[in-house]
Amino acid sequence: MIENYNDIAITDTRRKILNIIDKTLIAMDPENAIKNFIEKNNIKFDSKRIFLIGFGKAAFKMYSGIRPFILKDLVYASIIVPDDEKTNDYNELRILRGTHPFTGDLSVSSSISMLSGLKNLNENDLVIVLISGGGSSLFEIPEDGINIDDIKNISKTMMDKGCDIYELNMVRSMLSKVKGGKLATMLYPARVISFIISDVKNDDLSIIASGPLTRIDYRIEDLMETIKKYLGNDERIKMYRNIDDIYFNNVKQYIILKNRDFLDYIYSNINDDAVNLGSNFSGNVEDLSLILHNILKNIYSSKRKPFYFMLGGETTVDVKGHGSGGRNQELVLRFMKNSSNSEVYTIASFGTDGIDGVSPAAGGIVDSDHEIDNINEYLNRNDSYNLLIKNHGAIITGRTGNNVSDIIIGLYYNK
């Protein structure tokens, strides 16, 4: 899974951490996750007409896992995946492409095309919806009076200013015909079962892919505050329209894989004294790197011996430069920058989708034995990838076909 393993596995501790990352990505594969979930929960697909749609970075692998359970009664299947993702072919499956991390015309045309196969649905039909990270940009149809460039530019402006996923998706649902529960109105009166891989804090169904099947009750005050914070007085954004309960009565949603599952698997396989710090970390990478230092120092002052640690979540970066990098690579460099001579550590941070920001890497790994020069210079232009790749620190996996946000794993102690 890690393509440049030999280049970056330059210490025993690095090898151990990289081996665990590799093993975890394989074990947490979406194809296995959905198979195991269906069998464990004895889920039955009792309909003579089954329709399937899916969107997200894990859509193809999720389809591969559910396929044996539904193929006999399947009348239509179509998914939207990133435009650069490699997939195999199934005769019955229509694979469409979209753009990520910013939506675009390709995502819109694919979304319209995918939904065109869901005609004349009735209460005896079953629609299966496969949702995973990246779905917000891959699955999109703008509201009336909004065009795709509006959505793209608003999203980019908010992301560049360091918004979190909750704020971004709150605004996205205002601009879209399919987000914020609006997809549920299109699938009514059919029964709907959705299988979801969560890439957000607290596994909030209203946030994953901007909640296409979930009623979202935003407080007007929160929405207006978010719009003003990042966009000023932008009159393109309409108020959320209320959706009647009847459209959600036949919708069942199951989260089959989440960040916490990754952390639990890592914890069970570390085979050493370890601390699982949980999966709800968020905020700016600059702040989180300092917070993490303080947490680890406090743990060490209690343990008085080396320990492995792991945590998950999703951070943000204030983009000011035009370099190649991402939040995970910036985090490990900032951790190194803020460390003292008494601290001994190895730390890796990676995106489980295999893509970190605007770079070819999934994330980065650094340690206290291998000093890196000119960190500030590269951070100032958001060019973490080019610094790490020449210092044996960029983790390259390619697209994994998964996405449960980010994972941080490391070893820490003080001299």
Swiss-Prot record:
Q: Which GO terms describe its molecular function?
A: ATP binding; glycerate 2-kinase activity; glycerate kinase activity
What does the note accompanying the cofactor annotation read? Answer: Magnesium. It could be replaced to some extent by nickel, manganese or cobalt.
Q: How does activity depend on temperature?
A: Optimum temperature is 60 degrees Celsius. It does not lose activity upon incubation at 60 degrees Celsius for 2 h. The half time at 70 degrees Celsius is about 5 minutes.
Please, which domain of life does this record's source organism belong to?
Answer: Archaea
Q: Which InterPro entries does the record associate with it? A: GK-like_C_sf, GK_N_sf, Gly_kinase, MOFRL, MOFRL_assoc_dom, MOFRL_protein
Q: Which Gene3D superfamilies match?
A: Glycerate kinase, MOFRL-like N-terminal domain, MOFRL domain
Any Pfam family hit: MOFRL
Which protein family is named in the record? Belongs to the glycerate kinase type-1 family.
Assembly description: Homodimer.
Protein known as: Glycerate 2-kinase
Underlying gene: gck
